[in-house]
């Protein structure tokens, strides 16, 4: 690992694909990051149902061992003021920076992992990539640098210094100017312990491979077997019926428990990486 920025980005990337709780057909903001941060009175889900994009950033910083370099808050506006009060604010991106969106930066926040002349590349919590108003998880995003919605950047005081596109910081101690910057070495996410969701279409094509076998064994272990001969590598109707049992065990019903795997239920099944 080459530095704190790389560690932050690696931790954040490892969370891509994590989702908040879903209830009654809607995402309800209750995430593992909220549970780490704590209750906020007045919100649903027993105080855990609040927007969590800023909390995600604080959680990542904590897990990366640099909690003092990012604000620990659930409020984006509070986080903006935190960076500004430390003189760590810029209109230009930086690797590992906390980017803010909306009026005064109060609408949303993410972590920058790379940038070029046109785009900033980020990892964000409580967002999505489908255009829905309901943010539901952690995603990789690409944002236009000159989009009016983008407000600015907080620059953490990394011990190794900050790589930034801000020309005003060129030559200043603690900063390295780069017009474009890739993600730092060592910032790759670790190989997942569990098999990533292969996509809904994967199963509808009746695949035959080790993923299907591993899934079937986990369904049996969860008491959700509809198999007569035991799970095997070929996707069959027995797999679909077994998976429907798993969906019902999770509380899904109707079309949400039709036996076709979805990402949320798949992630909870913890199929070993094959």
Located regions from the model:
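Stable alpha-helical elements in mature extracytoplasmic
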Residues: 4-11, 53-56, 60, 92, ...
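N-terminal capping segments
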Residues: 1-64, 173-198
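Acidic, Ser/Thr/Pro/Gly-enriched interdomain connector segments
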Residues: 179-233, 238
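Aromatic- and glycine-rich peptidoglycan recognition patches
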Residues: 3, 87-88, 109-188
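...with weaker cross-activation on analogous glycine-rich loops/strands in unrelated enzymes
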Residues: 66-130, 263, 267, 273
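Extracellular LysM carbohydrate-binding repeats and other cell-envelope/extracellular binding modules
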Residues: 245, 249-274
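Sec/Tat-exported extracytoplasmic proteins
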Residues: 12-23, 61-68, 124, 219-226, ...
């Amino acid at each position: 690992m080459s530095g704190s920025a790389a560690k932050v980005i690696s931790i954040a990337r490892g969370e891509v694909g994590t989702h908040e709780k879903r209830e009654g057909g809607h995402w309800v903001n209750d995430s593992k990051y909220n549970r780490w941060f704590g209750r906020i009175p007045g919100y649903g889900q027993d105080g855990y149902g609040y927007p969590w994009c800023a909390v995600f950033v604080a959680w990542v910083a904590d897990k990366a061992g640099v909690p003092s370099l990012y604000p620990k808050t659930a409020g984006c506006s509070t986080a903006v003021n935190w960076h500004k009060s430390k003189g760590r604010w810029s209109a230009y991106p930086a690797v590992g920076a906390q980017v803010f969106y909306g009026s005064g930066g109060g609408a949303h926040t993410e972590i920058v992992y790379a940038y070029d002349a046109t785009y900033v590349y980020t990892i964000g919590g409580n967002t999505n990539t489908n255009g829905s108003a309901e943010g539901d998880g952690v995603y990789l995003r690409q944002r236009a640098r000159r989009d009016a919605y983008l407000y600015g950047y907080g620059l953490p005081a990394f011990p190794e210094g900050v790589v930034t596109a801000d020309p005003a910081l060129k030559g200043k101690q603690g900063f390295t100017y780069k017009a474009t910057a890739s993600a730092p070495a060592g910032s790759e996410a670790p190989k997942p312990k569990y098999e990533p969701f292969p996509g809904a279409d994967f199963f509808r094509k009746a695949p035959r491979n080790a993923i299907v076998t591993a899934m079937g064994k986990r369904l049996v272990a969860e008491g959700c077997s509809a198999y007569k001969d035991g799970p095997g590598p070929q996707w069959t109707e027995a797999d679909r019926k077994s998976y429907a049992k798993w969906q019902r065990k999770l509380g899904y019903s109707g079309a949400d428990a039709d036996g076709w795997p979805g990402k949320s239920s798949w992630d909870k099944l913890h199929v070993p990486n094959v």
